[in-house]
A protein has these predicted regions:
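Short amphipathic secondary-structure patches
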Residues: 1-26, 112-113, 170, 192
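Beta-strand secondary-structure signal
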Residues: 17-19, 40-42, 236
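Short, ordered "entry" segments at domain starts
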Residues: 25-158, 168, 300-343, 348-353
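Well-ordered beta-strand segments characteristic of repetitive beta-sheet solenoids
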Residues: 55-58, 79-84, 101-107, 206, ...
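Acidic/polar low-complexity surface segments
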Residues: 126-129, 134-136, 140, 146-153, ...
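Protruding loop/beta-arch "assembly-hinge" segments enriched in small, turn-prone residues
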Residues: 358-387
């Protein structure tokens, strides 16, 4: 018999309710047939997404691509968050962690209360989102020669070791005089750096302890701001087998700067200690336009990037860490004063109550948004109700 179908657009155009009715086929005439009612089936399909993309956990194989604990919070009110892990714990929300986003789309499942995600209920079993920056060329860095004056084993251009192979104590009379603490503590700290005891940096790299301005270039062994105050000139900073470390109350600020993290050992990591102060914006032009941090895709070993700074409120641009985990454990909001921030990482680990704020004021920002991120995501149609 003919089907009777009724379709109705509901929820402000975001959903469609379809009702299908059919009269049953009867084999007995008379009163028995008259008592059989029509069969009706209802279904509602909702459209979600289609907004800006500002946070992606890339790995499909991790137990949890977005792991949040201890009152950790993500505030991305006008953009979408994607977790590509297909595990049942793809998004983990433990100990009062919560997410506020326009869309949360999880390839696997959710461990924790779905009510911790607002204002919309998170979607599970979403198709993983392909890395939107996979075709973005890495910056042209040439042969990675250490062309900066602050090469490995140097402080402000001076030799770190004396002719006898011991720490040059004369340096304590100059730039090191600005380091907090006594002379003994300064010596101990520098010796730790030399021996590679700092997390993420086996090579000492450039060690900055006073107030200075750095030029773009290749920094073999990375840049270590130990209680210093560093202003970066615009350009690309290539960190080869050593990361960007800011600790002991160190300050790092720069406009129109981009960091390319490279080196086969995977030692070029971000290490922002709790006492550090960070303010950075990505380049406006060039092969790093819009890219604040760009991690080499071919790193061999996995060392986490750590953002624990309690004063890193201005991070404008895209942070791209496809091979490693980004750990966020600051006590104060991160990136909340930025025009926009986009983060794409292999995995996110948030604990100890941090609040990550992902703004989307792309139109007002002078920093371009890289193609593939910050753009509108594809809408997702999902069956919401069936009766």
């Amino acid at each position: 018999r003919p089907h009777i179908t009724d379709a109705e657009v509901i929820d402000g155009g975001k959903a469609v309710k379809v009702t299908i009715s059919v009269e049953p086929k009867t084999y007995f005439p008379g009163p028995i047939a008259q008592g059989v009612s029509a069969i009706r089936v209802k279904a509602i399909a909702e459209v979600s997404g289609g907004g800006y993309v500002c946070m992606i956990g890339l790995s499909p194989n991790e137990d949890s691509t977005l792991d949040m604990h201890d009152k950790a919070r993500v505030r991305a009110e006008n953009c979408a968050i994607y977790s590509n892990s297909k595990n049942k714990n793809s998004l983990r929300l433990a100990n009062k962690a919560r997410v506020k986003a326009d869309l949360v789309c999880v390839a696997g499942g959710i461990a924790g209360p779905k009510s911790a995600v607002s204002p919309n209920e998170p979607l599970t079993d979403c198709p993983p989102l392909t890395d939107p920056l996979r075709d973005r060329p890495e910056p042209n860095v040439g042969l990675l020669e250490c062309d900066n004056i602050l090469g490995a084993s140097s402080i402000l251009g001076k030799d770190l070791l004396g002719k006898d192979g011991l720490l040059n104590l004369d340096l304590l009379k100059g730039g090191l005089g600005g380091v907090l603490g006594g002379v003994g503590e300064k010596v101990k700290l520098l010796q730790q750096i030399l021996k590679g005891d700092l997390v993420g940096n086996l090579a000492p790299g450039a060690i900055v302890t006073g107030k200075t301005t750095l030029e773009p270039g290749t920094y073999c062994g990375g840049i270590n701001v130990i209680g210093g105050d560093v202003t970066l000139k615009p350009g690309t900073y290539v960190l080869n087998n050593g990361g960007i470390v800011v600790m002991n109350g160190g300050k790092l600020q720069g406009e129109n700067v981009g960091f390319f993290l490279t080196g086969a050992l995977g030692l070029s990591t971000i290490q922002f200690a709790a006492s550090s102060t960070i303010s950075l914006t990505a380049p406006r032009a060039g092969d790093m336009a819009g890219m604040l941090f760009f991690e080499d895709r071919d790193v061999l070993f996995k060392f986490p990037h750590i953002m624990a700074s309690n004063n890193a409120r201005n991070l404008v641009g895209t942070i791209y860490l496809p091979g490693n985990t980004l750990e966020i454990n600051a006590k104060n909001p991160i990136a909340d004063q930025s025009d926009y921030t986009v983060i794409v990482a292999r995995k996110f680990d948030m604990k100890d109550g941090p609040e990550l704020v992902l703004n989307t004021d792309y139109e007002s920002s002078l920093i371009p948004v890289p193609e593939g991120v910050g753009n509108k995501s594809r809408p997702i149609v999902k069956l919401a109700y069936r009766d």
